[in-house]
């Protein structure tokens, strides 16, 4: 047989086989909706990890290989029941399938993969969430302690009470043993007749002349500003959400026992994580119980915590500090102006 006859005899058959293979490949690519497949493949290029290595990282909950954004993307692109059924029923050569289908097939090897991915996401974010909770609760507890133990603040409050009793002398309010917190903010609104001087200016002036060491009382309350930005209700909700998340992880651990060898590493990592996480959540919950004593801060000022919660106490005190500092600065500025004016007048007297 000549080479020409050989080519003529077999080339057409070979070309038909190639066409059939291309047809099968194109047909395979259409197993998943084209747009869905394209979006999935775009996601995979961003992850850029071999599929087998990626799933090993998922089962090992290895946050050094996958970050939380990548995990959330994998969750978004988990195959649906319909897609899994479609691929299970596919009888062609799976090696010819597209990247999306290959990814779905790899994911399908892991039982309950979406739940495992969510557990992985929870694990990655847990450390940051606990750190933020600890930071917030410590700020609340520190602020409460600082306010209750500040001797300078107590003395300033005593001076304000004394001023109020003098102003109300001869009335039923002239022998008060305390005052409402909101009264702290009224000091800046109460002016002397025919004068720009307010009660706050007067308070600062008296303290500057007789007890100047009290003027920096705000330094005793360093945690107040950070604590004022914290909502105790939000902290409680976050702790509750984390606690519920751990409950789901315990259920996930139990469910994975029936997975067999494929989830062996996952079970060990998850079990160790749950043990550590439950200890940290217990510590945070205990700290929150102490933080709930923030209600005692309202009682400390004679207020009802139901009407004057921690957040309102801290914002009122911060406003008082701001108004106090402003009044003192204005007093100092006015004193300098008066001093310069007196100096000029004295100089003019000399030149007469």
UniProtKB/Swiss-Prot annotation:
Residue intervals of the FH2 domain: 1-350
Stored PANTHER family: FORMIN-J, FORMIN-LIKE PROTEIN 15A-RELATED
Gene3D superfamilies: Formin, FH2 domain (1.20.58.2220)
Gene transcribed to yield this protein: FH15B
Top-level taxon of the source organism: Eukaryota
Record-given protein name: Putative formin-like protein 15b
InterPro entries linked to this entry: FH2_Formin, FH2_Formin_sf, Formin_homology_domain
A Pfam family this chain is assigned to: FH2
Organism for this UniProt entry: Arabidopsis thaliana (Mouse-ear cress)
Family, similarity comment: Belongs to the formin-like family. Class-II subfamily.
